[in-house]
Amino acid sequence: MSLKVYNTLTGKKEEFVPIKPGEVKIYTCGVTVYDVNHVGHGRSLIVFDVIRRYLRYLGYNVYFVRNFTDVDDKIINRAKNECLPFTVIADRYIKEYFQDAENFRIEPADVEPRVTTHIPDIIDFIQRLIDKGYAYEVEGDVYFSVRKFKEYGKLSKRSVDELIAGARVEPGEKKRDPLDFALWKASKAGEPAWDSPWGKGRPGWHTECCAMIFKHLGETIDIHGGGLDLTFPHHENELAQAEALSDKPFARYWIHNGLVTVNGQKMSKSLGNYITLKEIYSKYDPDVLRLLVLSVHYRSPLDFSWEKMEETKKAYERLKGAIDEYEILKKLPENPDFDEHLYDEIAKAEQGFYAAMSDDFNTPEALASLFTLVREMNILRDKAVKSGGISKKALESYKEASDVLHSIGKEIFGLFDSLQPCIEVEEIKVEKAEEKIDTQLVEALIEVRNKARKEKQFEIADYIREKLSQLGIVIEDTPVGTKWKKK
């Protein structure tokens, strides 16, 4: 099946066709490293991590670049407040970023460039825009002439007339037109600066990404990604500069993830309503946030709450539990008369999963297919326990279902990093083997009963207690767990 991708540029889903067959070049805007990362940053990281993983699953050779903005007004201001060099602030939060990314199992980008190591590339980029007549210098500042680029506004669907109504010139700016934006800013006392043909200064935010993309990926890339809030002005300004300079399409597909909100308001540091990623993984398995992010379509807003984290934690435990329970089921006695299997359900789940993912990376629908399989696995488990055994075919089908969940979850969704797929291990022969097997069976049934009680499946729990009693086993539920003994 072909992959469909929603393209912000065209406002519709399109068949994904890379520039070069078999290869995909992706750039996403990274963080400005002046503070800790919050759930909003985490969502964007997870979304594009999964997109990258799925493209790779489809057989593409993916080259992924994500930058660091390591010089910026916010970084400079923080450095002044802490009486530290701006580089110390940037290095501190780049280190924190890598810690967060590792904890949430975000795969490192192939290249993670910093602005400060690309100053010559940025200067060259700006000079070429000046040479083509799209930029001009005024007393050490360099601006992009928006009206010169006739297609300005095509990404965000805004007209120049609409934009001019709300535009204004900040005090001290010398630009010719309120719409024009800075490519290079003349230095101010006490701020970092680099030599340039226009005097000492530092680059403007919108230019940095363009220069780094041109250097590492070329003039046209397959996918440019980022948060929805970057569409305008940042990505609009990037597109204008890049296409003005190259006379080529800048990106074939623009993909934007929706924002994270809290009670309907955007999560942000300025509003003080943010939850740090460190707080998340100090309270939860990082997989829980990944699953929460994937439970909402990437283009939709995600309203964060601790209640939703708790709900997602339970869902994650069901998913993980279905994988783990193979180890319990294989300890049940063989029952050839147990005529059940999961092969049809596995095929439906895989088909549904890949159909959803190929429809604009629809992770909620993809997850629904996996949880339908989990439900069928639980049904088979309960029937096997009630029947007192399981057939070889049923057990093998459960193992395959477990492996499918593990493989998809790990390779595409980035889950289950600590779990291992089901591997058959030959039982070690010891003296009194029969007694050992009986003990394993009892403990396996008690574990199934405990799970049933936790899921409020009391009929199953009572049934297991009764069957164990018939086998001469007494179980006792205590505050520290379930104990058992022979009558």
From Swiss-Prot:
It catalyses: tRNA(Cys) + L-cysteine + ATP = L-cysteinyl-tRNA(Cys) + AMP + diphosphate. It holds the Pfam family DALR_2. GO terms for biological process: cysteinyl-tRNA aminoacylation. It comes from the Bacteria. It is found in: Cytoplasm. Its EC number is 6.1.1.16. The keyword Magnesium does not apply. This is Cysteine--tRNA ligase. It comes from Persephonella marina (strain DSM 14350 / EX-H1).
